Amino acid sequence: MKQEIKKDDISGLSFEEALKQLEVIVENLERGDVPLEQSIDIYERGEALKNHCDKLLKVAEAKIEKIQLSNNGTPEGVKPLDPE
């Protein structure tokens, strides 16, 4: 079943929405029945979606971890932002 890959604005997508679109792209490319030009277009969109997901994951990670500094100010590890 072919699904249309829309060229909408990636930056407004949630992590889950972007991941779902990325899964559709991978499925279409793995099937191998997509014309070459379309494969290139959807591959490029897949790269943009992957980068968007990476960015969102880094933001989430920054919210839950805080860098621990040693006495001389150098980083020595991370700890939960709000330990309970």
Curated annotation (Swiss-Prot):
Q: Which UniProt keywords apply?
A: Cytoplasm, Exonuclease, Hydrolase, Nuclease
Q: EC number(s) of the enzyme? A: 3.1.11.6
The intrachain disulfides are none
Which reaction is catalysed here?
A: Exonucleolytic cleavage in either 5'- to 3'- or 3'- to 5'-direction to yield nucleoside 5'-phosphates
Q: Which InterPro entries match?
A: Exonuc_VII_S (IPR003761), Exonuc_VII_ssu_sf (IPR037004)
> A single GO BP annotation from the record?
DNA catabolic process
**A GO CC annotation given for this chain:** cytosol
Compartment(s) of residence: Cytoplasm
GO MF terms, alphabetically ordered:
exodeoxyribonuclease VII activity
Say where the protein is mainly found.
cytoplasm
EC supergroup of this enzyme: hydrolase
**Subunit text:** Heterooligomer composed of large and small subunits.
Query: What's this protein's family per the entry?
Result: Belongs to the XseB family.
Q: What function does this protein fulfil?
A: Bidirectionally degrades single-stranded DNA into large acid-insoluble oligonucleotides, which are then degraded further into small acid-soluble oligonucleotides.
Name by which UniProt lists this protein: Exodeoxyribonuclease 7 small subunit
